[in-house]
Amino acid sequence: MARLIDARPDFDPHAWIAQLPPMDLYGALLFQIVGQQLSVAATRRTLERIQALFAGHLPSPAELLAADPGSLRQAGVSWRKIGTLRDLAERLSDGRLDVDVLSGLSDEEFMAALTAVSGIGPWTAQGALLIALQREDVVLPGDLALRKAVQSAYQLDHLPSQQEVVAIAEKWRPYRSLATSYLFSAAFDGTSPSP
């Protein structure tokens, strides 16, 4: 990581996040859910189609619950993701989840609260911690782009498993988010990171 950091003296760790649409925690959760198994570009296009259904804005939880699931499917959202979006919207609408409360939770509590939602796993919750809450010690070991960046940075002859990424990232504590940002940036701008 030292060479990657030294090679980028003017690096802005938030620049890659700034390339994403502006979003609060709820928006980041929608982005992460819609973006499961998709590229950032495909996620953006799908979100744009969703916004077109709601007069150009992301739907509130109440709007999402009132929406015809078929229209969301036509916008490119899979049935499984529609179920996840609806479960999240129900929990936010009935008070089982509250974005203000979630924002104040520790990372572990946040992860536990969100992964209780059907269809939200660690990658989705970790992404929201990183993108919306900008927590300092988050890594997304399940993210394929990050795994490829770690492979390149550490000159591995194989794509590291999620467990290998977690083990490698232990060295980055308590600034795993910063290291993740360097690696994502290198992956997105096409440079070859070195450790």
Where are these regions (language model features)?
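N-terminal polyanion-binding entry modules of DNA glycosylases/AP lyases
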Residues: M1-L105, E109, A167-P195
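Catalytic DNA-binding helix-loop module of base-excision-repair DNA glycosylases/AP lyases
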Residues: V34, S106-S152, L178
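A short linear-motif detector with a strong N-terminal bias
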Residues: T43-R44, L64, V117, H158-Q162
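C-terminal end-helix/capping segment
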Residues: P59, G142-E170
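Helix N-cap/coil-helix junction residues
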Residues: V77, L97, G119-I120, L156
